[in-house]
Curated annotation (Swiss-Prot):
It comes from Rhodospirillum rubrum (strain ATCC 11170 / ATH 1.1.1 / DSM 467 / LMG 4362 / NCIMB 8255 / S1). It catalyses: 2-C-methyl-D-erythritol 4-phosphate + CTP + H(+) = 4-CDP-2-C-methyl-D-erythritol + diphosphate; 4-CDP-2-C-methyl-D-erythritol 2-phosphate = 2-C-methyl-D-erythritol 2,4-cyclic diphosphate + CMP. InterPro entries: IspD, IspD/F, IspD/TarI, ISPD_synthase_CS, MECDP_synthase, MECDP_synthase_sf, Nucleotide-diphossugar_trans. Its cofactor is a divalent metal cation. It comes from the Bacteria. The gene is ispDF. In the N-terminal section; belongs to the IspD/TarI cytidylyltransferase family. IspD subfamily. In the C-terminal section; belongs to the IspF family. Its EC number is 2.7.7.60, 4.6.1.12. One of its GO terms (biological process) is terpenoid biosynthetic process. This is Bifunctional enzyme IspD/IspF. HAMAP family: IspD (MF_00108), IspDF (MF_01520), IspF (MF_00107). GO terms for molecular function: 2-C-methyl-D-erythritol 2,4-cyclodiphosphate synthase activity; 2-C-methyl-D-erythritol 4-phosphate cytidylyltransferase activity; metal ion binding. 4-CDP-2-C-methyl-D-erythritol 2-phosphate binds at residues 234-236, 260-261, 282-284, 358-361, 365, 368. Bifunctional enzyme that catalyzes the formation of 4-diphosphocytidyl-2-C-methyl-D-erythritol from CTP and 2-C-methyl-D-erythritol 4-phosphate (MEP) (IspD), and catalyzes the conversion of 4-diphosphocytidyl-2-C-methyl-D-erythritol 2-phosphate (CDP-ME2P) to 2-C-methyl-D-erythritol 2,4-cyclodiphosphate (ME-CPP) with a corresponding release of cytidine 5-monophosphate (CMP) (IspF).
Amino acid sequence: MAKVAALIVAAGRGKRFGGDLPKQYQTLGGRPILRHTLARFAAHPDVALVRAIIHPEDRDLYGAAAHGLATLLDAVEGGAERQDSVRLGLESLTDVAPDYVLIHDGARPLVDGALIDRVIAALADHPGAIPALAVADTLKRGAGGMIGQTVDRAGLWRAQTPQGFRYDAILAAHRAQAGTMLTDDAAVLEAAGGAVALVDGAEDNAKITTFADLERAERLFRGEGEQRIGSGFDVHRLGPGDFVTLNGIRIPHSHGLVGHSDADAPMHALTDALLGCLNAGDIGRHFPPSDMRWKGADSAIFLRHAAALITALGGRILNVDITILCEQPKIGPHRARMSARLAEILEISATRVAVKATTTEELGFTGRGEGIAAQATALITLPF
């Protein structure tokens, strides 16, 4: 499978929007616009890497907006113009060398997974692909408040982002076209002789440029929602040690759980359940065991990340349910603390967090005390 990276362009000042706060940090559904945009790509199962390109003065704003989205690459600073910023972003990816790169406006927070799918799919056959909408309105060219000409709209398209490219091709094109001030990245590849395909765009994938655009996005964002159910399952074997960590609670035990992180099986199962609600892959995609950053890591990082993806998409966690399978240790004395800890991480009421336990009647690996297993179910709601 091709390695896909996403560059989120958020280095502009948004002069047409007005105000002191750049538009990408204005709030939509109580969260910064840019956070929603980042989360859409971080949650996509085929996007392996996400990096923002930001203004040098926006480090603190970006840090607050991206807080809790643990899998993002470090942001890079942009240049004087959008084209400069994108080139710098592309250069920053040379060490990871993706096959494809998606370049997206930070102020398009309502991009959906199906549109991203279409762009990625087109790159198998074309060096570039962009989402676009056929022009439906009659077009007029005029000056001084008067119509000078009616323009034939046949074959005209409104370009959107994410604009997708084979990485080597768009990097070479940006290097060759530096300083030419082209209006989008497709134009950069075109100028270098590359072919760019069109795929279906989406009306809701509009760029927020004015306050009226933000009001429209807010109406779409807060529309009637849908419910999603996800499930997760995890197992960790028991080895040397004198405690186990279950749902964030350290419990004395004759053995310890073995794993790359803290081996918190029920919290891992719950993380997978939440990611499943979003069709966002599994915990191993977001936090691969090959990455030493997560060696011995507190699993609350993983769970908080999954919850942040849901919140950034305008969703709410309605309830979660976890069952721990083990003979020992006894879970009952720790159940209330487990529920409270999970509720704290997920920022929901403990009444929405069910923690249960069962034995397997001394059958199987859990019955023999070789490991601990857990299964989890989550119910969330997302706006349409």
